[in-house]
Amino acid sequence: MNGADLIAQILKREGVKILPAFPHSDLIEAASKISVRPIIVRQERQALHIADGYLRATGGQSACATTVQHGPGSENAAGALAQCFADNVPLLHLPGGYATADQGVSPNFSAARNFQHISKWCEAVHRVERIPQMMQNAFAQLRNGKPGPVVLEVPHDLYTQDADPGLIDQYRPQRRSTPCADGSDISKLVDRLLAASAPVIIAGQGILYAGAADELTQLAELAQIPVISTLNGKGCFPENHPLSLGCAGLSRPDGVVQFLNKADLVVGLGTSFTRSEYITPFPRAGRTYAQLTNWEGDIAKDYPIDFALIGDAKPTLAAAVKELCERLGTSGRRGNS
């Protein structure tokens, strides 16, 4: 076993099925030997774009890794990595690095140093025996908290170095933790939902990544609240549903603007409320904003937030649905907003 075999075995243990890649990387052959399918691309960015699309299509529920050659290969992937970072895509990127003896020699490119600001977590591994621990840390970052790309740079000479077969036994697959928001905060959110005369829900990509589409639908139906999806959240709420107003993109249905303008409560669920020229701007004055997010850095980032909850969307919305059923009955309230 060598370093490439060790990393490939870890990827398989974590459920990685495809490895979009640009040669040369010894990880490509190591992965193919154990049925982790390499997808060879013609330009480095394409590897990350393939993984990006795959992860969005599966709602972030599948694991996916990418690899490219060190130096120019790693540099060429930067634009696609920045896109994944901007859109919170939970991708594991394993760029090659210069040999350990050449680290820190100018102008050799270091992904670990240069990708710090376009990734959620960015490190390098320098010894074969550290691979299990660094990969475990990488997957823990990948699976928990706010989604985003995780980068682990692997010097190319580590791929061919001998690795003790017992190292794989040190690896512990990482699970996703789904903390629920505080119970009293959930009750206060339900109070606000029921007290509002014209509430609107803004549902984001966090609903998809949490697998909380069913809970969102139940909440909207019980409280009879119309739902607008963000661009990245498109698909989290069925657009043929009577309570769907459509997507709040730059091009949007008239109902999106009409309901936002008359809303007295705007509730963001699984969204960062990020301002963008591609997203419908939300009115600020004369309304209350509530937000459910799994990362405190999203709160009041671009909009004034009156009430925030921190937690995973699925258990938090499930608890809100349970409380609504207790207050309103399983049929919910009559009429709609």
Predicted regions and their residues:
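N-terminal alpha/beta PP-like core and its mobile active-site loop of ThDP/TPP-dependent enzymes
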Residues: M1-G332
